C-alpha cells in the first residue's frame, strides 16, 4: 500500500493553484505524488448538494448543518485536523492517522519534499 496525501483545496483557491504551479510541477515532487502517494483532493467549496443535510457538532461545541460536499470536506478538515484554510496538506495512513504533520501555503520545494519524505518514512514504520 501507499500513504495518502489529503489535499484540502478549493475551486476558487488562488494559493492552491500557486502551490500546484510552483511546487507540484517540480520533477522530484511530481514523482513522489505520482508514485509514492495516493493523492485525494477535497474541494471545500464544492457546491454539490448532499442527498440529505447532516447535523454535526463542531470542535468548539456549536452545531453546524452540512448541506454540500464542500461543507463535508471543510468539516473534516476542521474537526480532524484543527485547520480551516486552503491549501492544507496532510499525509495519513490507511486508517486516517496523520503521518508527518501538515503543510500549508508556502512555495518551498525543499520543505514540501521533506514533508512528503517524512510521511513515507513514518508510513513504512
Predicted feature locations:
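Short pre-active-site segment immediately N-terminal to redox-active cysteine/selenocysteine motifs
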Residues: 1-4, 9-15, 85
Amino acid at each position: 500500500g501507499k500513504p495518502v496525501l489529503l489535499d484540502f483545496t478549493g475551486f476558487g483557491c488562488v494559493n492552491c493553484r500557486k502551490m500546484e504551479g510552483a511546487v507540484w510541477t517540480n520533477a522530484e515532487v511530481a514523482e513522489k505524488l505520482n508514485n509514492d502517494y495516493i493523492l485525494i483532493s477535497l474541494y471545500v467549496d464544492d457546491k454539490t448538494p448532499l442527498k440529505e443535510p447532516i447535523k454535526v457538532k463542531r470542535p468548539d461545541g456549536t452545531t453546524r448543518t452540512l448541506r454540500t460536499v464542500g461543507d463535508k470536506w471543510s468539516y473534516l478538515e476542521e474537526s480532524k485536523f484543527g485547520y480551516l484554510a486552503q491549501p492544507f496538506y496532510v499525509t495519513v495512513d490507511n486508517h486516517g492517522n496523520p503521518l508527518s504533520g501538515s503543510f500549508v501555503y508556502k512555495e518551498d520545494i525543499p520543505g514540501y519534499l521533506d514533508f512528503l519524505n517524512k510521511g513515507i518514512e513514518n508510513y513504512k514504520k
